[in-house]
């Protein structure tokens, strides 16, 4: 996929902060430090469109990115980070719930999980939440380059089992380091638009 435009548009916590609903949106969700920013940067072939951090909990708002004037990526705060206050976590949860349940141009959600580990309880809750609201889900298993080839099938099966993965959704092993999964991710995203 040729990327000729990838721009940060705005951040928001309430609907009045969201950009005008002119482009279909795809949200990116996952645990803190699962690789959401690296995923975005790899897809758009930029090093720092979405800021990466070794410190979990960096994303605290909904961040909107215009990609090729065709789709808006919406990076949501990571969940499961223990060093954020309970009040702040609850506020993020309400912000994300409002976005996921009211944004009519939301076409799907990319749920990122770490392929090296079974999904956390928070990952399962998020997947169940998205399915409950009948949102299309693309599960992207990040950090593929961190496991041996022989472990891939076992890890994929464990993730699908733990999530009770719906076969109508898409599952993509992905590496921000090697680029494996980039084409499959774009194909899945465009199928949802």
From Swiss-Prot:
Necessary for normal cell division and for the maintenance of normal septation. The lineage of its organism: Bacteria, Bacillati, Bacillota, Bacilli, Bacillales. Gene3D superfamilies: P-loop containing nucleotide triphosphate hydrolases. Belongs to the TRAFAC class TrmE-Era-EngA-EngB-Septin-like GTPase superfamily. EngB GTPase family. It holds the Pfam family MMR_HSR1. GTP binds at residues 30-37, 57-61, 75-78, 142-145, 174-176. HAMAP family: GTPase_EngB. GO terms for biological process: division septum assembly. Mg(2+) binds at residues 37, 59. This is Probable GTP-binding protein EngB. It comes from Exiguobacterium sibiricum (strain DSM 17290 / CCUG 55495 / CIP 109462 / JCM 13490 / 255-15). InterPro entries: G_ENGB_dom (IPR030393), GTP-bd (IPR006073), GTP-bd_ribosome_bio_YsxC (IPR019987), P-loop_NTPase (IPR027417), Small_GTP-bd (IPR005225). One of its GO terms (molecular function) is metal ion binding. The gene is engB. GO terms for cellular component: cytosol.
């Amino acid at each position: 996929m040729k990327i000729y435009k990838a721009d940060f548009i705005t951040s928001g916590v309430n609907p009045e902060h969201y950009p005008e609903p002119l482009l279909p949106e795809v949200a990116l969700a996952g645990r803190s430090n699962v690789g959401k920013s690296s995923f975005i940067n790899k897809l758009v072939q930029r090093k720092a469109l979405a800021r990466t951090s070794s410190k979990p909990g960096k994303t605290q708002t909904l961040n909107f990115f215009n990609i090729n004037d065709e789709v808006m990526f919406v990076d949501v705060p990571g969940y499961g980070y223990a060093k954020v206050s309970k009040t702040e976590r609850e506020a993020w949860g309400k912000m994300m719930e409002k976005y996921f349940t009211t944004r009519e141009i939301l076409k799907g959600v990319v749920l990122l999980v770490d392929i090296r580990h079974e999904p956390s309880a928070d990952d399962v809750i998020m997947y169940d939440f998205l399915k409950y609201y009948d949102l299309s889900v693309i599960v992207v298993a990040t950090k593929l380059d961190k496991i041996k080839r022989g472990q891939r099938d076992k890890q994929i099966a464990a993730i699908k089992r733990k999530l009770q993965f719906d076969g109508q959704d898409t599952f993509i092993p992905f590496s921000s380091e090697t680029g494996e999964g980039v084409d499959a991710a774009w194909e899945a995203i465009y199928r949802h638009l």
